[in-house]
């Protein structure tokens, strides 16, 4: 058979299996590099949006800093009690990929969510980390009293901190380990410690119950005093690097220690036929905890 005949067969076969002879999946943008040598990479192994940030000298396959962008989007309609999920990340290569675009030092994509909400997500590599921005456009007359996208940075390798020995928050009197009020976490069997969530209030009232064991099988630990800034940071094992997350305003900050994730997820209202924006900054700094904190303080009010 001629090459043209084989090509015709491939094209006809693709009409029946939903593919095309040449891949119809959008191209993955190239890695973006900043002046400090950090690289921002769109993860090609997952169809749904995942980013990786590579420290200087790390290979492009490194997953020490992986960000699900976002892990989910949820909202609560006006005058309703229940929160509804508008999007949920699912790992793996199956499914449609977003059409990523590179715009200078940023990667951008658009996604249609449930509830007639359109999301434009932008991740910009800055000199000291990544700024994540979510723009919501409501195409219906239904108002949401609140909507939020959960940015999910997951830290492994030298940043992995399953017993919260290097993960800090900031109170009015200075830094404190997120898990400081649970000293038993350092010695209890991991099967007793995990699964867990450790939370600390910022604007929300501090829960009266310090430890909650809920029906989902997860133990929730609530710190007894609020933080004075929506900031959470994890040091690398050698104390050379800091990964920290900061937002302008949130209800609380928290972590799942098994994943060493950092959550500072703003919630905003979204009017019918309206627009809303949220942002967070993930700082990645070669330096001290104080260095990362000073940058967070300086940049916090620039966030949406």
Give, region by region, the residue ranges found by the protein language model.
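Beta-strand-rich recognition/accessory modules
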Residues: 25-36, 54, 101, 112, ...
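Beta-strand elements of well-folded, non-transmembrane domains
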Residues: 115, 138-140, 157, 282-286
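Boundary at the C-terminal end of the N-terminal hydrophobic targeting segment
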Residues: 15, 20-26
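Low-complexity, serine/threonine/proline-enriched polar segments
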Residues: 165-219
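Acidic-aromatic substrate-binding/catalytic surfaces of carbohydrate-active enzymes
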Residues: 26-97
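Bacterial N-terminal signal peptides
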Residues: 6-17
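Acidic (Asp/Glu-rich), glycine- and aromatic
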Residues: 125-126, 130-186
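Extended, loop-rich substrate-binding clefts of extracytoplasmic carbohydrate-active enzymes
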Residues: 75-127, 143-147, 158
